[in-house]
Amino acid sequence: MQKNMKTKKTKKRGRKEGNTPETERRMEPARSRTSAIPSGLRRRSGPSTPLRPGPEVRHAPTWRTASATTADSHRISPPYTPSSRGRHIHTRGARTRTRETSAAEINGVYARAVTRKTKRSETIDRLLLSVLPGHGPHASLRSHLRARSALRPPPDPPR
């Protein structure tokens, strides 16, 4: 164990003595690699990264000229507005499918009941349903009771 350490030391000493600027430069990446800084941080910081020249010259005044601002305004995209057609349907997770929205849907014929949870793509407006016979406010309850009463005879009146 000690022998190994000794040989390592002598090797280092030999390398240090015969150092030329070229070998020094060659060794530098190896030395920085052993440092404890994570590679992402190391890559960003330090003089090794070439400094990109800024858009403005250093001695120029800081305020922008009118021509520069107009050029900038052209470059900036207009505020994002989702298209009137193509609605996002939520599937499991964060993925979304786009579905063509029908003209009726755009004009507001369908109910607000079309939420991301409903499996049916389209529903008829609740007001329209309430007008139709057998589709009133408690239609589902009534139909359920009707189905049950058809199966067995009506119960005897209470005494």
UniProtKB/Swiss-Prot annotation:
Output the superkingdom of the source species: Viruses
Q: Where is the composition biased (Basic and acidic residues)?
A: 16-31
Coiled-coil residues: none
Q: Where is the composition biased (Basic residues)?
A: 1-15, 85-96
Region Disordered: start and end of each range?
1-100, 133-159
- The name on file for this protein is Protein B1
Taxonomic lineage is:
Viruses, Duplodnaviria, Heunggongvirae, Peploviricota, Herviviricetes
- The primary gene name is B1
